[in-house]
Design a protein with these regions (language model features):
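Feature activates predominantly on carbohydrate-active enzymes
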Residues: 35-38, 42, 80-274, 280-308, ...
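Noncatalytic modules at the cell exterior or secretory-pathway interfaces
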Residues: 692-703, 722-729
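Acidic, His- and aromatic-enriched active-site or binding-groove loops in soluble protein domains
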Residues: 296-312, 316, 343-363, 450-458
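Structured mid-domain segments that build the active-site/substrate or prosthetic-cofactor binding neighborhood
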Residues: 247-253, 261, 368-482, 493
Length: 762
């Protein structure tokens, strides 16, 4: 046995002596061990041979990479104690030794990733792609000395959780790109501590926490829930409904008690967290009690009521935990900056100003510069007014939640992040960037966000080129970069808020646009050299082709079946990286149904022979907007064989339909047909809504519940304003005893067609 051990030791020394060495302290921390593992993994591929990891004092061969708190580093005057948790240092001692040092738990890891990026051009562009140029030499400049720390203290880009079997890859991808906050993903990402990940926000979670604070309340706390417009305090079912009564002293007491419990529980687990989030539920409800509404008048904003509530909590907790900072959100109606109130020094205001695709107070054009674009003048004022009152955290939106595919964020990203950092002095940033599969250049958007959150002074254009070369290949990159600029230029030509524009209403998305864009993609695919590069390009082709199909429905493509097949194949190739299995199955099912609908022979319109029909909307354009209540049903007498239907109501509640314009409610209309005047044949009939003026966000609805809805924004024209004035006709069928005397059918209202017709000359 003794001879075997001696032989093994000799082999180890020979192996170490035959190659460059990564040197760890004699007793390395977990972060130092991980940093060495990362170096060995990537450098081995870059230089084409193993790079061994040894402990300090073990025989090895120069050049040496000294990782962490080594005696060698200490001998050069570099003490680990001097570093902040995310601070890092690269310092060469000639060409034979390099010190990679930093703080715990992440600084030393950041030093290793900085070295890999700066000296070997190694990148992590998405969760499954690692870009490592091969055939390199392990070398550096003899006078190399770099140090730094992240620009934003808390950094998070939220893309959405993937399947559990992908969570490890996701954790590593985020950590390598120096994100330190994963929202609620922190609780399901396995053992992330080896990558330096710790909780950045304390319990209970990282968003919409009111519900967590109230979950244990009993009937005796009824007065602490928000009061509705009927004068009743109601317990919310979840965070999507209801709020709290913030003027009630008992609510303050309960929140203070719960916060203390959270702090104590976190510290018992070793999590000494600085920031705790106390934020409203995810809705725009306000407590209607007299005291809360009086506070709203006093502060000229619902935000003032919330700040007054949070101030009391901060004041109570400060006595025992003066270092704790409370983050609260200026959300929905609370987004208006208050007057006549000072904000406690330990309170930070989070600013989630949502895009104009949402109704209400939301006006922001999230794809444009806050500081420079005229569409964001109002929101810039809101941001700066809050920043005058308190330190601010940014909750940003890098995605449109409607028709997001062909709106690029590239131009606005660097402008906005630098505005938040330099002008608003924010050091906390969370960005929602969902739906990367259906977003043009989604991986680039996320990766560039990583770069600027980490280093606000990064050369943005150079970083863009670097990503393009790594992700699409140096030969295809020029075409993909030109495609990005082409789409950006087209976006810039639209004066309307992109969040309010439907796909059909976008004036920049012409058939010529798609033809030119396809040219860039075709040339890029021809230039790409590897299957991986082609796969990445085909993901962007999917976004273009799918939006082309949805807008023009193959009118510009003679080979319909081949085009539709290409879309599906590109989706199936790339979707597993970005979407859950159930989401993929749902998309494929809906896509196939949509393609079937495009091939359906629609019944001709009758009764409008002397009118000019501007738009004829049938299935599959008619689709569910309130899926729980509305169904797409097969129906032989429907114009396209399918229709939207609402049923499951047991009595007559009105034969009502209307037109709603969120941008100009005075433009809205509603009509009700008296029950006695309803046709009794249970067939489709046309009903006129009268003349309307189309806008980017307008829609029609059917039934007093509004559960049947259809957007007319697709029909809005930014270039032919005269076509926005039209008369709307709905083809509706009323069935069942609620509408037809003596009927044996179920009660149902069905919409199969919407006609927009040129108004008659007066």
């Amino acid at each position: 046995m003794k001879k075997t051990l001696i032989l093994a030791a000799a082999l180890l020394l020979f192996s170490a002596a035959d190659a460059e060495s990564i040197v760890l302290p004699a007793n390395p921390t977990e972060s130092e061990r991980t940093a060495a593992e990362e170096l060995a993994l990537h450098l081995g591929k870059a230089v084409g041979k193993p790079v061994p990891v040894i402990r300090e004092g073990t025989r090895g061969t120069a050049p040496f990479l000294y990782v962490g708190a080594t005696e060698f580093a200490r001998g050069k005057g570099i003490s680990a104690k001097r570093f902040e948790p995310e601070e890092w240092l690269l310092q060469a001692c000639g060409k034979e030794a390099l010190i990679l040092a930093g703080g715990e738990p992440r600084g030393v890891l950041y030093a290793s990733w900085e070295f890999l990026e700066r000296c070997f051009n190694i990148l992590w562009p998405d969760e499954e792609t690692v870009y490592i140029p091969e055939n390199q030499k392990l070398q550096w400049k003899g006078d190399l000395k770099l140090n730094g720390k992240p620009s934003f203290e808390i950094r998070c880009i939220f893309v959405l959780l993937k399947e559990l079997d992908r969570r490890d890859a996701r954790r590593v991808y985020l950590a390598r790109n120096r994100m330190n906050h994963f929202l609620d993903e922190e609780h399901v990402l396995g053992n992330s501590r080896k990558y330096g990940i710790r909780r950045m926000l304390g319990s209970p979670r990282s968003v919409h926490t009111f519900m967590d604070y109230m979950k244990d309340w009993g009937p005796e706390q009824l007065q602490c829930y928000s009061m509705n417009k009927e004068g009743k305090h109601v317990r919310p079912l979840n965070h999507l409904h209801g709020q709290i009564c913030m003027s009630n002293p008992e609510t303050v007491r309960l929140f203070v008690k719960k916060l203390r419990e959270y702090i104590a529980a976190d510290r018992a687990k070793g999590d000494f967290v600085k920031y705790y989030l106390i934020s409203s539920n995810d809705n725009s409800d306000e407590c209607q009690c007299p005291a809360c509404q009086d506070g709203k008048k006093k502060y000229a904003s619902w935000g003032g009521v919330q700040i007054s509530f949070i101030n009391k909590i901060a004041e109570a907790v400060e006595k025992d935990y003066p270092e704790i900072k409370i983050i609260t959100n200026a959300y929905h109606t609370a987004s208006i900056p208050p007057k006549n109130i000072r904000i406690h020094k330990n309170v930070i205001v989070d600013l989630p100003l949502m895009g104009a695709e949402f109704e209400g107070l939301q006006t922001r054009d999230t794809m444009r510069s806050v500081k420079r674009h005229p569409n964001n003048r109002r929101d810039r004022g809101v941001y700066e007014a809050w920043a005058e009152l308190a330190p601010v955290a940014m909750w940003d939106y890098w995605i449109l939640y409607k028709n997001n595919g062909l709106a690029v964020y590239h131009k606005a990203m660097s402008d906005n992040l630098r505005y938040y950092y330099h002008d608003l002095h924010s050091r906390i940033i969370v960005a929602e960037c969902e739906y990367p599969m259906t977003t043009m250049f989604g991986p680039l958007r996320v990766w560039l966000g990583f770069r600027l959150m980490y280093n606000i002074d990064e050369d943005f254009d150079a970083a863009t080129r670097r990503f393009m070369n790594a992700y699409y290949g140096t030969k295809a990159a020029p075409e993909m970069l030109a495609l990005l600029q082409f789409i950006q230029n087209c976006n810039d030509g639209v004066s309307y808020n992109l969040g309010t524009m439907s796909l059909g209403g976008r004036p920049d998305l012409t058939q010529d646009f798609f033809k030119k864009a396809d040219g860039y993609i075709t040339r890029a695919l021809a230039a790409a050299e590897t299957p991986e590069q082609k796969k990445h390009i085909r993901k962007e082709r999917f976004v273009l082709d799918y939006n082309n199909l949805c807008k023009f429905r193959n009118r510009a493509n003679p080979d319909m079946k081949a085009f539709q097949k290409r879309i599906l194949e590109d989706y199936q190739l790339n979707a597993p990286l970005y979407e859950r299995k159930k989401e993929i199955e749902k998309f494929i099912s809906g896509y196939r149904d949509f393609c079937l609908g495009l091939a359906v022979k629609v019944k001709p319109v009758r009764g409008f022979e002397n009118r000019k029909i501007l738009h004829d909307l049938t299935w599959p354009v008619l689709k569910q907007r309130v899926p729980a209540k509305t169904k797409v049903v097969d129906m032989n007498d429907a114009a396209a064989g399918k229709a939207l239907q609402i049923k499951d109501f047991d009595k007559y509640s009105g034969f009502t339909f209307g037109f709603f314009d969120p941008m100009n409610k005075k433009n809205s209309k509603v009509k009700t047909v008296p029950r006695a005047q309803l046709p009794q044949d249970e067939r489709f009939h046309y009903y006129s809504l009268g003349e309307v003026e189309l806008s980017p966000q307008c829609y029609i609805y059917v039934h007093p519940s509004w559960h049947i809805q259809q957007s007319l924004g697709e029909c809005f024209s930014a270039t032919l304003q005269e076509d926005n004035r039209c008369e709307v006709f709905l083809s509706l069928k009323a069935e069942g005893p609620a509408y037809v005397q003596g009927s044996k059918k179920e009660n149902a209202l069905t919409l199969d067609r919407v006609l927009l017709v040129k108004p008659l000359k007066k």
